[in-house]
Amino acid sequence: MYIKNLYLDNFRNYDNIEIDFNKKVNILTGNNAQGKTNILESIFYCSLGKSHRTNKDKELIKWDKDEAFIRLNLSRKPLDKKIEIKIFKGGKKGININSIKLKKISELFGIFNVVMFSPEDLKIVKESPGHRRKFLDMEISKLDHRYYYKLVQYNKILDQRNIMLRNKKFLNNDMISVYDEQLSKFGSSLIESRIKYLNKLNEKGKIIHSDITKGKEEIEFTYLTHVKGRENISEELFSLFKDSYKRDVEKGNTSVGPHRDDFSIKINGIDARSFGSQGQQRTSVLTIKFASIQIIKEISSETPVLLLDDVLSELDESRQEYILNSLEGIQTLITCTGIGDIEKYLKNDFNVFRIDNGRIAEY
């Protein structure tokens, strides 16, 4: 699977551009703030129907326009795909696949998988549990529409429970019990799927991390949850909701459940978030991203497109070399301010595009 070409109209700082991509490596070079990341953002948007940088779609529209348009032509077996997205200033969007309008955004998932690696991904290792949950939810949703449905249902019911907890004069124990039962049903399925995904991440990640560090480090991912057992997760989750009820009423929110869970990342048995060096933290993210590629390939039988947004400059030479030597068979788009030493690691089949204030020239 690879992107054949991309057309943008009034997207971010682009008036109207069309780019034909190499099926192997494409390098987008230019000074900062010229629009390199905007191209990757538009491609990411075609995968999940959302930006990796903002929750406000109106920010994607050129400042003096009312709508933006993205068209991405994809070579994909057994049938090529044309993804077209209109983004409106009022907040709505329209998505078509091969000229057929999608009824819901989840229908887009799995059509076109990408793995994005940007400096912000360090948050997966360094910052709060919410970033790690977001990573899990996004990666699993790409591969399983049912997971996304259950996640949406869980969050809707959670919101209803929290509203009732905060409005004590409307507190209804019978209704809380109904919410607890529904949350246990959907929540247990989320936990099971996350644990399965982390098992795969461990399986792939251990080999990748050992390769990157030349056998000096071992990485391990462990799911962290209030649920102790693994046999009757739904029943245990229901008990946890019941046991936390008084505390939840006092605080006005739900204190247990998959929306509070986390996963640890350990390097040689030491927590990478608290005690890992910056180099170890960067390597952990690199491991996670390349393991994600392998998981997508294993489950979907298709290789995702890899988007590297200004990350090579953040890595030392050995890690740069690992990435650039691992691109065989993966269409890759790389943004950077200059080619520098990248070229010596790449085979001849790559394209270079110069980005200058929303204008693109191939050379």
Curated annotation (Swiss-Prot):
It comes from the Bacteria. The lineage of its organism: Bacteria, Bacillati, Bacillota, Clostridia, Eubacteriales. GO terms for biological process: DNA replication; DNA synthesis involved in DNA repair; double-strand break repair; SOS response. ATP binds at G30, N31, N32, A33, Q34, G35, K36, T37. PANTHER family: DNA REPLICATION AND REPAIR PROTEIN RECF. PROSITE patterns: RECF_1, RECF_2. Keywords: ATP-binding, Cytoplasm, DNA damage, DNA repair, DNA replication, DNA-binding, Nucleotide-binding, SOS response. This is DNA replication and repair protein RecF. Belongs to the RecF family. Its main location: cytoplasm. It is found in: Cytoplasm. The RecF protein is involved in DNA metabolism; it is required for DNA replication and normal SOS inducibility. RecF binds preferentially to single-stranded, linear DNA. It also seems to bind ATP. The gene is recF. One of its GO terms (molecular function) is single-stranded DNA binding. The keyword DNA damage applies. One of its GO terms (cellular component) is cytoplasm.
